[in-house]
């Protein structure tokens, strides 16, 4: 394979593979009954042992006994109190225990593995110690930025991100010098597998192996194959951590095959849609009425930033063009634009230079832009889990938000029924008089 050749890139269509319906929280790895704490289920070998700290709600990050440099960075970021998932996972994870964690969008899962791995890391020049994999380029880029944010007082820590759609030669050049060789690698499975296979990236010193949005990678056969090959290139005694907002009963045993007696953490009952502070509505209308209704909503609603989801790259481009012609400050992010342009647009939106983003499901998972407080499903997704990930872009980390879904076909009505059944909610119709902005504006 030539180094310049673009490798496997997982497109929007592949991301639409329907997730299996999730059930209630599983029992522990040893078959022990799970330990329930409110809406938090904890199980696994460490859950009931003294000294594991599980269930002790720390009042601050200092209680985790993290490195001083990390605590300084956390303070700089303005974080005061850990989220529920951080309180449960971090004290056990820093003891080198494997972790399988499912928690809804916006609860701070990324910080769990970023802080844990940075705390444990002792950088050695020319050695990669931490490997983090995710299923899209945008998420890889964002995770790399999180590492940069929290390692600002750790000057010896080098982080690199590798994904398909960019020239492989650049990656090889970075890996060929001890001065630039990263101690932390973040990337997508296709590109990482190629670098390992071509012996450009060595994984023999890996101490932590992390999968973010693990169900998406282990659900799809070709991605799972890449993950397995990469896993086999790492040492047997590493720590394995996996995270996702949705973990079906079918996927959990697959995850646990990579692990040794993991701590299992499932926040909130799987069947409940609990995005706290997020108002959700639907609007019934014909396909031809969507543009007019969207225009009305963007004109009448107050919002900081809005993300509008559509079902294809072509529709994303067309809707973005239409919005710009109507003088709305819009941008489109989907797999139909070049990687360089995609990252540029993502940064433009994240830095608040644009307030409206039209996107496909490639933007539906894990992307964390705190100013988004309105999500519109111009096209309803194909399944309930995709709906959860999409609307979770608004109302991140406990803030308020508003989600509106257009329902225009019989198939949409079926998906709406599935959402209501899956999450045991009854989504109301959008009120004719609109919604008071104080209900969703922080």
From Swiss-Prot:
<dbReference type="Pfam" id="PF00271">
    <property type="entry name" value="Helicase_C"/>
</dbReference>
<dbReference type="GO" id="GO:0051028">
    <property type="term" value="P:mRNA transport"/>
</dbReference>
<keyword id="KW-0508">mRNA splicing</keyword>
<dbReference type="InterPro" id="IPR014014">
    <property type="entry name" value="RNA_helicase_DEAD_Q_motif"/>
</dbReference>
<dbReference type="GO" id="GO:0003723">
    <property type="term" value="F:RNA binding"/>
</dbReference>
<feature type="short sequence motif" description="Q motif">
    <location>
        <begin position="59"/>
        <end position="87"/>
    </location>
</feature>
<keyword id="KW-0747">Spliceosome</keyword>
<feature type="domain" description="Helicase ATP-binding">
    <location>
        <begin position="90"/>
        <end position="265"/>
    </location>
</feature>
<dbReference type="GO" id="GO:0016887">
    <property type="term" value="F:ATP hydrolysis activity"/>
</dbReference>
<dbReference type="GO" id="GO:0006397">
    <property type="term" value="P:mRNA processing"/>
</dbReference>
<keyword id="KW-0378">Hydrolase</keyword>
<protein>
    <recommendedName>
        <fullName>ATP-dependent RNA helicase SUB2</fullName>
        <ecNumber>3.6.4.13</ecNumber>
    </recommendedName>
</protein>
<dbReference type="GO" id="GO:0008380">
    <property type="term" value="P:RNA splicing"/>
</dbReference>
<keyword id="KW-0067">ATP-binding</keyword>
<keyword id="KW-0539">Nucleus</keyword>
<keyword id="KW-0347">Helicase</keyword>
<dbReference type="GO" id="GO:0005681">
    <property type="term" value="C:spliceosomal complex"/>
</dbReference>
<feature type="domain" description="Helicase C-terminal">
    <location>
        <begin position="293"/>
        <end position="438"/>
    </location>
</feature>
<keyword id="KW-0813">Transport</keyword>
<dbReference type="Pfam" id="PF00270">
    <property type="entry name" value="DEAD"/>
</dbReference>
<comment type="function">
    <text>ATP-binding RNA helicase involved in transcription elongation and required for the export of mRNA out of the nucleus. SUB2 also plays a role in pre-mRNA splicing and spliceosome assembly. May be involved in rDNA and telomeric silencing, and maintenance of genome integrity.</text>
</comment>
<keyword id="KW-0509">mRNA transport</keyword>
<keyword id="KW-0507">mRNA processing</keyword>
<dbReference type="InterPro" id="IPR027417">
    <property type="entry name" value="P-loop_NTPase"/>
</dbReference>
<keyword id="KW-0694">RNA-binding</keyword>
<feature type="binding site">
    <location>
        <begin position="103"/>
        <end position="110"/>
    </location>
    <ligand>
        <name>ATP</name>
    </ligand>
</feature>
<keyword id="KW-0547">Nucleotide-binding</keyword>
<dbReference type="InterPro" id="IPR001650">
    <property type="entry name" value="Helicase_C-like"/>
</dbReference>
<comment type="similarity">
    <text>Belongs to the DEAD box helicase family. DECD subfamily.</text>
</comment>
<dbReference type="GO" id="GO:0003724">
    <property type="term" value="F:RNA helicase activity"/>
</dbReference>
<feature type="short sequence motif" description="DECD box">
    <location>
        <begin position="212"/>
        <end position="215"/>
    </location>
</feature>
<dbReference type="InterPro" id="IPR011545">
    <property type="entry name" value="DEAD/DEAH_box_helicase_dom"/>
</dbReference>
<dbReference type="InterPro" id="IPR014001">
    <property type="entry name" value="Helicase_ATP-bd"/>
</dbReference>
<dbReference type="GO" id="GO:0005524">
    <property type="term" value="F:ATP binding"/>
</dbReference>
